[in-house]
């Protein structure tokens, strides 16, 4: 977080946590500038709590949740598909690993351990 605060000369105005991990939610909040907002999009496991320092709220920092990315499926999904088909949305860049069905257990273990973020099972044609 120190490097982010240094590069931005005091922190970011908006930070988005999208992995669903306790550590990255805490990091998103820690890198905020005074008055900044951290939005938690990722699904942090049920029952897991994040830890924040009360002092940081004196700097008017905020943290908020997001339900399903606050999307509107009927409007957003057709637009996202169109962006993908036109080459404006590069979904392949979001894939950490491509797996065979026989590797699913290893892939799940890697995801759970934080070694990969998004795996895709590839079936032979």
What are these regions (language model features)?
Residues 1-62, 125:
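Glycine-rich cofactor phosphate-binding loops and adjacent beta1-alpha1 units
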Residues 18, 66, 97:
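Active-site-adjacent beta-strand anchor residues
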Residues 6, 10, 14, 26-30, ...:
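C-terminal hydrophobic helical "lid"/dimerization subdomain
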Residues 36-39, 51-93:
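Rossmann-fold dehydrogenase core element
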